[in-house]
């Protein structure tokens, strides 16, 4: 979400502070995920999950949020997509938490409703620290 829509993340780069970044790796029996997230980016996305629509959604999240994200997911897609999506959500949450650090430069929660193509997108985000992902 950029400033046009009321960003959750106030940019640190305007005041000369370092960019807020995180690198998270998670390996389980079902998945192997690596993610680099820069909250003060420009919308660059390099996402490979093996799930086309999920890649598209993460790419849209990154581009419209003006974040930079590299995300590589290897999962047990021969079973189904559940583990890959769930574990990517866990990694994304950890990356956001690490990148915002002390939370001094953010608003705790925000929401956005956006008509995009034939879809109405509703996103609500709360950075209180309680884990939850709906896809």
PLM features: what roles do these ranges have?
Residues 2-135:
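Structural preference for solvent-exposed beta-strand-turn elements
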């Amino acid at each position: 979400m950029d400033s046009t829509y009321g960003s959750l993340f106030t940019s640190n780069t305007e005041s000369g502070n370092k960019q807020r970044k995180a690198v998270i790796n998670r390996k389980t029996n079902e998945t192997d995920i690596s993610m680099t997230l820069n909250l003060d980016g420009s919308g660059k996305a390099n996402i490979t999950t093996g799930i086309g629509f999920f890649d598209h959604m993460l790419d849209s999240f990154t581009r419209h949020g003006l974040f930079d994200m590299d995300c590589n997911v290897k999962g047990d897609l021969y079973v189904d997509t559940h583990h890959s999506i769930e574990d990517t959500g866990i990694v994304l949450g950890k990356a956001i938490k690490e990148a915002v650090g002390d939370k001094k430069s953010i608003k705790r929660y925000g929401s956005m409703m956006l008509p995009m193509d034939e879809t109405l997108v509703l996103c609500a985000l709360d950075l209180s620290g309680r884990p939850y992902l709906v896809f």
